[in-house]
Amino acid sequence: MRFIIGGAGSGKSQRCLDELTQAAQAAPAGPPLILLVPEQATFQVEQALLGSGRLKGIIRAQVLSFQRLAWRVSLKAGGLALPPLSDLGKQMVLRALLEKKRDDLRLFHQVADKPGFIERVAGSIRELRSYRQGPESLRRQLSQLEAEGLGETSLGAKLHDLALVMDELRSYIEGRFTDPDEYLTVLAARLEESRLLEGAEVWVDGFNGFTPQELAVLGAVMRSARQVHISLCIPPGQLYKAGGHHSPSDLFHPVLSTYDQLMQLAAESGVAVDPPLYLNEPLRFRGAPELAHVERYLFRQSAPAWPGAPERIALVEAQNRREEVAAAAREILRLVREEGLRFREIAVVARDLEGYGDLAATLFAEHGIPAFIDRRRTVAHHPLVELLRAALEVVVQDWAYGPVFRYLKTDLTGVSRAEIDLLENYVIEHGIRGRAWQQQEPWQYLRRYTLEEDAVPAGPAQQALLDEIHRIRRRATAPLLAFQRRLQRRGRPGPTVREITTYLFQLLDDLKVARQLEAWKAEAEQRGDLETAREHEQVWTRVLELFDQIVEGLGDQVLSPKVYLQVLSAGLDGLKLGLIPPGLDQVIVGTVERSRHAGVRATLILGATEKDFPPQPAEDAIFTDRERERLKQSGLDVGPTSLERLFQEQFLTYVALTRGSDFLWISYPLADESGRAAAPSPVVGRMRRLFPELKPRPAAPPAPDAEAAVAQVATPRQLAAAVARALRRARSGYAVEPHWLDLYQCIVLDPDLHREGAAVLAAVGYEEWLRRRGTPVGRELARLLYGDRLVTSVSRLEAFLSCPFRHFAGYALRLQGRAEFTVSAPEFGLFYHAALSLFVRELERDGLAWDTLTPDEAWRRMDSIIDRLAPRLQSEILLSSPQHRYLLRVIRRTLQSSLDYLSEHVLHGEFRPVAVEVPFGEEMDGLPPVEVDLPGGGRVLLRGRIDRVDALEGRDGRWYVRVIDYKSGRRDLRLGDFYHGLTLQLLLYLMAVVEGGEPLLPGTRVPAGALYLPVYDPVEPVNAPVPPDEVRPLRRKRYQARGLVSDDPAVIQAMDAAGLGLIQAKLKKDGTVYKGAPVASPDQFRQLFAHLRRVVRACGEQILQGEAAIAPYRLGPHTACQYCAYRPVCQFDPAVEPQGYRRLEKMDAPDVWQRVAAAGGEGDV
């Protein structure tokens, strides 16, 4: 045996390749020449071996990993008698075994169902096997603990459970499979007798350490081969520490320990050790002395400072990871364009690849950089994996909403996304779940917008919708229903694993999944996305292999679909794809230990923070560090502790910093992904001590001027992004420099630039912003939408005056939010209105007066009404679940409490309800519409429905009219809001009855009031217990009717004869009204009505002219955007466009009275 000793960059790997190549050239036929490397490096080393051009092919020379060598030995011995049990198969078997032995487990049964636990158990068993530990050694350690009285500790429970599981696993595997975890053990035992390496020369390269299993194999290799060369990354000057003279904190401690182990192994194997070959010169850094300085001195206690600023090393700090990766992309393009590097000569290293991998894939693609993310990618969210999981969950969870639509949205079911959206909206609206999916009859659920009549048949449009829903449902569920029927066939104990797996494959076959994946693969190849193409291909192959493993491992066992789902999920969770780099010239993004970068000239290290570089290894999920140390002291080595792994990470940091030959670029974010401050790695401090003039530079230039912005531009898409940022400032009211507008015109006019930048500019919405700020929809389009006669409602006018675009989106485009099967504020309001209206109508029908009813009689009537209305609300939603039945109790309690206080208005007042749910408007069976003529000849016709009209006939024969609007909460009529058109409804209803109420109240009608009546069950906060006789007055304040009433004391007296505070207006002892009360004289009512007409006229004119601007109001702290459903459509951003608000003047009642009095009955708003 001979060691090849040298530090990073000294040419160890190249020396191994050169010696192997020379031997192969000298004697093309002869004993094997084997280069033994880590599994993940085999592809890149083979490329390097053949890429030199000195070998035209491989005959003697072989690049092998330990696993591949084991396979060669078994092949020479006649092959594997039994199929191997893959890692995924083992996880699924473990899942079933844990379920089977659940009652015998001491600890694992508590966490067996947690995601990832099975994978951790499988990993622990693999680690134990690699350290040549079995259930016997675990039980010996458990017996030792029990002798010390510690058998019931957590460590004892873990040893017991692991030994039990390993025993069960071995019993299960025996005679059925071979265990890949035992391959190296078998290899060590059989290698010598196989004579595979007889006369062979072996080079071992790329390892920093070996497991006990691998050391046993190396011992057999030493005894079998003619010559073994082992390269180790140890600077020759550090080798004096070998033989146990190094501490765990020493940088090269992991490799020196490996050297010691190999020397001991050679001695035990009777193998002579030749003098080492020392490689003293850092050949890699011949053209970059700064990097040689890093390799030699970075981790030394004392080191000379580098004179001057290094030209080939950069430190970069970024605000966040995204900015950091974007800066790395720009640096890669600079290296390629200015330094002449190829993409394949650039390595990007991240210790936290999970945090950087997706960002690198996205941003590098945006910059046009070909890149391969070197990681085993999980496919847990691939549509095929999701389909399998969801299909089983549908059966197990009895067609719950989530699994059904996860199944449908995989795009593998033959149903289009538009059809799925239609079906999903219908299902959500009507709360469909469970057996309703399995019924043969078409669904007939329809939403009702009134509760006061029995169900009516579906109209033509509704029936067409129901027919379409039925067609989609039948097509979407037919294969899944067939799968369920196969699973649930009666007359047998239950399906076996083999049968369930067969049924799943039949489902995939029914859906033609293989054909769809092939089509996706072809599409990906056509657009040049080779990684995705291979992913679609591999995931199908791996799923079929998974099915084979399930059947081979558990085939004839009877499992319930629920347990089978758990077993399959364990396999799917561990399903990862290792993709070979699809291109020859591309940047490799990976971790230090996984990616082998040959011929790297530039290394970019991302995420050099205190937390991640080197990372702080977490404790193992099974054995804690303290438990590992205790076991090691007792003679049971189960692997390194987190502290030992931290020392290994320090060595890997050294490897990462010395990987590139020409350039080193280190970056770190100042904040993590959660926004918390992140400190730079200690490595950054060491670099600055080595290079005092090395200063961190910002990833993005801080100045917002054009030169700094353009300095960040590397691609047409980035140019568009820079222009978009500048134009977005225009939306905030700032001036835009002329050169940005010039660049904008370049992007719009240049076909290539526009193709790349159109999406970015569309996202910022600059063109749309210009359009909506400058021009309305237009009179012609408005005429098509509305006609010359604008028939509308007051709520629509309020929406327009709140924000014109809100009106346009809701009433012109008719955009609606998704209707859901839930009881929210609108449904509560609908129920309350219906119940109170029906209460009054039935009193009238039965010839009863409200004030003659006792509270109990009134409540019995209301209780009966609630029972009749409850099934009518949204397909019996109030009876559909315990949660909704509780809401019905809330409704019942609210109406009981509200009815009690509403009755006081009848008992202590003279106004009586004359009609409820009073319609007004064209083609409505009620009062005529409120009509307002427009200057251009058009007309606005207002319609609506008034909750309740009360009246009192005066001695003069005139009708005093009061309108009531029920509200599910306390509401005030603020005259300032009315003046601006934000709350027109209540006073417009009063005007509709006063001016057009002849069919209801013949004669002269006088406005007496417009009031909001609360229907709710408030809680009154108090500071101390309240006597029973004071409770009612306190609650009565909460039920007070609020609004505007006549200033006539007689009218106020008629509304609250007992002075109980039923309304806001109160009379003094002398019969006059208190100052500041919300009252109006007849003239003031006329002035309000005149103002109302002016608002309607102005509003109607703008609507018919096509006004649809995004111009939300702001009035004090309130804005139109607070509860607007259309914000995702308009994209109005208050933080970016504060100047975009239409600011309204805050006005109190005196201000309003002054304005409307000055305007009189004429003029504009």
UniProtKB/Swiss-Prot annotation:
<keyword id="KW-0238">DNA-binding</keyword>
<dbReference type="GO" id="GO:0051539">
    <property type="term" value="F:4 iron, 4 sulfur cluster binding"/>
</dbReference>
<dbReference type="InterPro" id="IPR011335">
    <property type="entry name" value="Restrct_endonuc-II-like"/>
</dbReference>
<dbReference type="InterPro" id="IPR038726">
    <property type="entry name" value="PDDEXK_AddAB-type"/>
</dbReference>
<feature type="domain" description="UvrD-like helicase C-terminal">
    <location>
        <begin position="282"/>
        <end position="597"/>
    </location>
</feature>
<dbReference type="GO" id="GO:0046872">
    <property type="term" value="F:metal ion binding"/>
</dbReference>
<keyword id="KW-0408">Iron</keyword>
<comment type="function">
    <text>The heterodimer acts as both an ATP-dependent DNA helicase and an ATP-dependent, dual-direction single-stranded exonuclease. Recognizes the chi site generating a DNA molecule suitable for the initiation of homologous recombination. The AddB subunit has 5' -&gt; 3' nuclease activity but not helicase activity.</text>
</comment>
<protein>
    <recommendedName>
        <fullName>ATP-dependent helicase/deoxyribonuclease subunit B</fullName>
        <ecNumber>3.1.-.-</ecNumber>
    </recommendedName>
</protein>
<dbReference type="GO" id="GO:0004386">
    <property type="term" value="F:helicase activity"/>
</dbReference>
<keyword id="KW-0347">Helicase</keyword>
<dbReference type="InterPro" id="IPR014017">
    <property type="entry name" value="DNA_helicase_UvrD-like_C"/>
</dbReference>
<dbReference type="Pfam" id="PF12705">
    <property type="entry name" value="PDDEXK_1"/>
</dbReference>
<keyword id="KW-0378">Hydrolase</keyword>
<dbReference type="Pfam" id="PF13361">
    <property type="entry name" value="UvrD_C"/>
</dbReference>
<dbReference type="Pfam" id="PF21445">
    <property type="entry name" value="ADDB_N"/>
</dbReference>
<dbReference type="InterPro" id="IPR049035">
    <property type="entry name" value="ADDB_N"/>
</dbReference>
<comment type="similarity">
    <text>Belongs to the helicase family. AddB/RexB type 1 subfamily.</text>
</comment>
<dbReference type="GO" id="GO:0008409">
    <property type="term" value="F:5'-3' exonuclease activity"/>
</dbReference>
<feature type="binding site">
    <location>
        <position position="803"/>
    </location>
    <ligand>
        <name>[4Fe-4S] cluster</name>
    </ligand>
</feature>
<keyword id="KW-0411">Iron-sulfur</keyword>
<feature type="binding site">
    <location>
        <position position="1121"/>
    </location>
    <ligand>
        <name>[4Fe-4S] cluster</name>
    </ligand>
</feature>
<keyword id="KW-0547">Nucleotide-binding</keyword>
<dbReference type="InterPro" id="IPR014140">
    <property type="entry name" value="DNA_helicase_suAddB"/>
</dbReference>
<keyword id="KW-0269">Exonuclease</keyword>
<dbReference type="GO" id="GO:0005524">
    <property type="term" value="F:ATP binding"/>
</dbReference>
<keyword id="KW-0227">DNA damage</keyword>
<keyword id="KW-0234">DNA repair</keyword>
<dbReference type="GO" id="GO:0003690">
    <property type="term" value="F:double-stranded DNA binding"/>
</dbReference>
<feature type="binding site">
    <location>
        <begin position="6"/>
        <end position="13"/>
    </location>
    <ligand>
        <name>ATP</name>
    </ligand>
</feature>
<dbReference type="InterPro" id="IPR027417">
    <property type="entry name" value="P-loop_NTPase"/>
</dbReference>
<keyword id="KW-0540">Nuclease</keyword>
<feature type="binding site">
    <location>
        <position position="1130"/>
    </location>
    <ligand>
        <name>[4Fe-4S] cluster</name>
    </ligand>
</feature>
<comment type="subunit">
    <text>Heterodimer of AddA and AddB.</text>
</comment>
<feature type="binding site">
    <location>
        <position position="1124"/>
    </location>
    <ligand>
        <name>[4Fe-4S] cluster</name>
    </ligand>
</feature>
<dbReference type="InterPro" id="IPR011604">
    <property type="entry name" value="PDDEXK-like_dom_sf"/>
</dbReference>
<keyword id="KW-0004">4Fe-4S</keyword>
<dbReference type="GO" id="GO:0000724">
    <property type="term" value="P:double-strand break repair via homologous recombination"/>
</dbReference>
<feature type="domain" description="UvrD-like helicase ATP-binding">
    <location>
        <begin position="1"/>
        <end position="324"/>
    </location>
</feature>
<keyword id="KW-0067">ATP-binding</keyword>
<keyword id="KW-0479">Metal-binding</keyword>
